[in-house]
A protein has these predicted regions:
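N-terminal signal-anchor transmembrane alpha helix
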Residues: 2-27
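Membrane-interface helix termini and inter-helical loops of multi-pass transporters
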Residues: 29-43
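Short aromatic-rich membrane-water interface segments that cap or initiate transmembrane helices
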Residues: 39-53
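Non-cytosolic membrane-interface motifs at loop->transmembrane helix junctions
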Residues: 39-42, 99-110, 129-134
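Core segments of transmembrane alpha-helices
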Residues: 54-65, 83-88
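Membrane-interfacial loop-to-transmembrane alpha-helix junctions, especially the N-terminal start
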Residues: 72-81, 130
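Membrane-interface helix caps and helix-loop-helix hairpins in membrane proteins
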Residues: 93-103, 124, 149-154
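Final/C-terminal transmembrane alpha-helix of multipass membrane proteins
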Residues: 132-151
Length: 154
């Protein structure tokens, strides 16, 4: 029975993460002339490294959702994770499709705030999930710093 719970958690994590990844990739339409014209910070990593960061973030989310399902911490953690995912999708849409850096900064600010709430909840509930979720939280803080510099420089 424990094996079935773990598999169910992994499947739920994969489904949740793939839905967010699909929606983000559906919204991703990069206009390179516009993107290259932006004033970007010196600490912005190369696109290949950013892709690797996002891939690690997806894997960590799968592990977190699987742990939430098997540990029966499903509500309200999944609601907060879903809101983080939705605001991330809206960020990608605002930044790459609408080319609105102010709206994109607002969405990444909301995502980082929700990730902070989630990180604090995980530290209170279960330290193991908090440690699993820490790379996601740090990624949102890094993204917030990058978008802050881009927003206030352009």
């Amino acid at each position: 029975m424990d094996y079935i719970k773990k598999l169910t958690g992994i499947v739920a994590g994969l489904f949740f993460t793939l839905m967010i990844a699909w929606a983000c990739s559906f919204q991703l339409k990069v206009d390179f002339t516009w993107y290259n014209s932006l004033c970007k910070p010196s600490f912005l990593v190369k696109p290949d490294v950013m892709t690797a960061f996002v891939g690690v973030m997806y894997l960590v989310n799968i592990v977190v959702v699987a742990r939430l399902v098997t540990g029966k911490h499903f509500f309200p953690s999944m609601v907060i994770l879903s809101l983080v995912g939705v605001t991330s999708i809206l960020f990608v849409h605002a930044f790459f499709d609408l080319k609105n850096v102010y709206l994109a900064f607002t969405f990444i600010l909301i995502s980082a705030g929700l990730a902070l709430v989630q990180q604090v909840r995980f530290f209170v509930k279960e330290l193991r999930i908090a440690l699993y979720y820490l790379p996601v939280f740090l990624f949102y803080i890094y993204s917030l710093l990058v978008m802050g510099v881009i927003t206030f420089s352009n």
